[in-house]
Design a protein with these regions (language model features):
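Short, surface-exposed patches at the edges or C-terminal ends of soluble domains, predominantly
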Residues: 1-210
Length: 210
C-alpha cells in the first residue's frame, strides 16, 4: 500500500521528490515553477492548462478550458481567438465608485462571472472583448474605450465626473446603463441627457401557471 502522507516535507521541492519516489517517477521529468515561468508565466491564468495560438510575428492569443460540461473551446471561442489577430478588440470600461456593481467580486449582485471570469465560456474576455475598470474621479475616459458601463450606481456623480462623462458622450461614445428599481433619482440625471428616463415601478412578465 502506497503511503501518500507528506509528513516532514516542508518545502515544495521535498514534497515533489517524495511524490516522485512514491510513484516511481524520475523527478527530472518535471519542471519547477521557476523553469515553467521561463517558458510561459501562467500566474495570471491561475496556473491552469491552456493553449497558446501564435503567429509567425510573435502575436499570441489564448484558448482556455472552461468550467462547464463541454470544457474545450467551441468554434465560437476559437474564431474569437483568431479574430484577435486581425481586428482590434472592443474595449469595455466598467465605471467604479458610487457603490456600483463590481467586476472583481463574485457575489450575487456583482459582475465577475460575465465580465472577468476567465473560465466562464461566455465572459466578455472569452467572447472577444477587452475589459478594464475606470474611475471618472481619477481620469477622463481614454480614447481607446469603446463602451462605458454604468452599473447601478447608488450615489450621484460630482461635477467633475459628470463633465468627464459628458465629454465621452459628446464624442459619440457608447454607453451601457443599468439601474435597479428605485434608483430613478440617481440615474435619471445621466439618462435624461440622451432622452431616456427610468420610470417608477417594476415590469413583471406573467406566465400561465403564475
Amino acid at each position: 500500500q502506497l503511503d501518500f502522507r507528506l509528513e516532514g516535507c516542508n518545502t515544495l521541492e521535498e514534497r515533489a521528490q517524495k511524490m516522485a519516489n512514491i510513484l516511481n517517477l524520475n523527478i527530472n521529468m518535471f519542471l519547477t515553477p521557476e523553469q515553467i515561468r521561463e517558458k510561459i508565466d501562467l500566474r495570471n491564468e491561475g496556473n491552469h492548462f491552456l493553449r497558446v495560438v501564435e503567429r509567425d510575428n510573435g502575436q499570441k492569443s489564448i484558448l482556455r478550458l472552461f468550467n462547464d460540461n463541454e470544457k474545450h473551446p467551441s468554434e465560437t471561442e476559437i474564431s474569437t481567438a483568431l479574430k484577435r489577430f486581425v481586428v482590434q478588440s472592443p474595449k469595455v470600461a466598467f465605471l467604479t465608485g458610487h457603490e456600483m456593481r463590481d467586476i472583481y467580486k463574485t457575489g450575487d449582485r456583482d459582475y465577475n462571472q460575465f465580465a472577468e471570469n476567465q473560465y466562464f465560456r461566455y465572459s466578455l474576455g472569452n467572447q472577444g472583448f477587452d475589459v478594464v475598470t475606470l474611475s471618472l474621479e481619477d481620469q477622463e475616459v481614454p480614447e481607446d474605450i469603446d463602451i462605458v458601463v454604468i452599473a447601478d450606481m447608488k450615489t450621484p456623480f460630482d461635477e467633475i465626473e459628470n463633465d468627464r462623462l459628458n465629454k465621452y458622450i459628446a464624442r459619440g461614445g457608447n454607453l451601457f446603463i443599468l439601474g435597479d428599481a428605485r434608483r430613478q433619482e440617481i440615474m435619471n440625471p445621466i439618462t435624461e441627457q440622451i432622452g431616456v428616463t427610468f420610470m417608477p415601478g417594476t415590469l413583471i412578465e406573467m406566465k400561465e401557471n403564475d
